[in-house]
Amino acid sequence: MAKSNEGLGTGLRTRHLTMMGLGSAIGAGLFLGTGVGIRAAGPAVLLAYIIAGAIVVLVMQMLGEMAAARPASGSFSRYGEDAFGHWAGFSLGWLYWFMLIMVMGAEMTGAAAIMGAWFGVEPWIPSLVCVVFFAVVNLVAVRGFGEFEYWFAFIKVAVIIAFLIIGIALIFGWLPGSTFVGTSNFIGDHGFMPNGISGVAAGLLAVAFAFGGIEIVTIAAAESDKPREAISLAVRAVIWRISVFYLGSVLVITFLMPYESINGADTAAESPFTQILAMANIPGTVGFMEAIIVLALLSAFNAQIYATSRLVFSMANRQDAPRVFSKLSTSHVPTNAVLLSMFFAFVSVGLQYWNPAGLLDFLLNAVGGCLIVVWAMITLSQLKLRKELQANDEISTVRMWAHPWLGILTLVLLAGLVALMLGDAASRSQVYSVAIVYGFLVLLSFVTVNSPLRGGRTPSDLN
């Protein structure tokens, strides 16, 4: 199938997509949240990361197969519609848009709190400046977004590699003042699995969503000059990112720190990354990690403005959103869609400070389960579309392994994750909240199918 980006630009290069593939999931969740999983499972959190990582690798391989065959700015929303019709594309697109909008607010609030403390100003000031700045970056041309994400990702990858090198040197006692630690912390008095299988299950719930946002690379690929090559490289990078960056970081932390001394971090000073850099007598570690955390949050925010605008643009072209959002500027940027993302970024940030009757709690709970729905629908879409893609000779650079068995295994693993969430009092509300939100969107898709928004066409007309 010929490349189709619906009139968008082609300013992204393979290097942009490859670096995005490496760095897109290296965020504040890794630097601040890793300790939550370690505290729950001890060193056995590695098993939780392996299980969660396997799910993500399989999902991305399936998504990569469809994206390489049919590059589209709507990505999995478009493939859901191709596979199951209007209801799937509509509900999946708006669900992911909702998820990113809510996460945008939380991330900007976190970054603004740190920057406000730096400059001695109210957090809303850096928040306003950053939202406007990244909106402008995304309004000018897609190349600007790509360059920012390239360098954001480059810095994050460089920091993780430096952390791994320093950590290994500390483990083997190669740095001044350090001694060989062996497995005294990794095994210690409590063993590899101090809290048993239940601890690993709790750890899995803590780390399962650490890889969220990885799907954005397939949205961006539609604006690449070589989408199939870019998608192939980005999908392959997923395995390296999980095995080296996540598993490597957790190995270093669990070898150097007793698991019972590790907790989830609310500040950079509490991050296990900061504490390990301090072991190496590196000065200014707290300030350095604060800067890296801010960079990670702003990188995610920039990517989410981009992804939400392209999703709305794609849905507008498919008549699942008002047509005004399909308008392109002379530089092939969906200006109105970017402005919509900017507006809701302000709304989402505002909700972080003004929480009417628990609305924010409900919305953020729904976000926790959105990824499971998205990953499940990606899997179902690939299982449904594979025969059609083969018949049309569309499968090219990326092919799902052991089809359909690994796809079925992915669904089983996702079902198991849902079962764990239902069995956990803290996670149960996430399942209920996303079920309400997604059910509402599915119903809305049937209500709007013959609305003026779609020009009175039926799904079969659109196909």
UniProtKB/Swiss-Prot annotation:
Sorted UniProt keywords: Amino-acid transport, Cell membrane, Membrane, Transmembrane, Transmembrane helix, Transport
Gene name for this UniProt entry: aroP
Catalyzed reaction equations: L-phenylalanine(in) + H(+)(in) = L-phenylalanine(out) + H(+)(out); L-tryptophan(in) + H(+)(in) = L-tryptophan(out) + H(+)(out); L-tyrosine(in) + H(+)(in) = L-tyrosine(out) + H(+)(out)
Domain of life, source organism: Bacteria
Residue spans crossing the bilayer: 18-38, 40-60, 84-104, 117-137, 157-177, 200-220, 237-257, 276-296, 337-357, 358-378, 402-422, 431-451
GO cellular component, as recorded: plasma membrane
Phenotype upon loss of function: Mutants show reduced aromatic amino acids uptake.
Membrane topology designation: Multi-pass membrane protein
PANTHER family named in the record: GABA PERMEASE, GAMMA-AMINOBUTYRIC ACID PERMEASE
Task performed by this protein: Permease that is involved in the active transport across the cytoplasmic membrane of all three aromatic amino acids, phenylalanine, tyrosine and tryptophan.
The keyword Flavoprotein is assigned to this record: no
Pfam families: AA_permease (PF00324)
Main location: membrane
Signal peptide (UniProt feature, chain positions): none
Protein family: Belongs to the amino acid-polyamine-organocation (APC) superfamily. Amino acid transporter (AAT) (TC 2.A.3.1) family.
Localisation: Cell membrane
Protein name, entry field: Aromatic amino acid transport protein AroP
Biological process terms in GO annotation: amino acid transport; transmembrane transport
PROSITE patterns given in the database record: AMINO_ACID_PERMEASE_1 (PS00218)
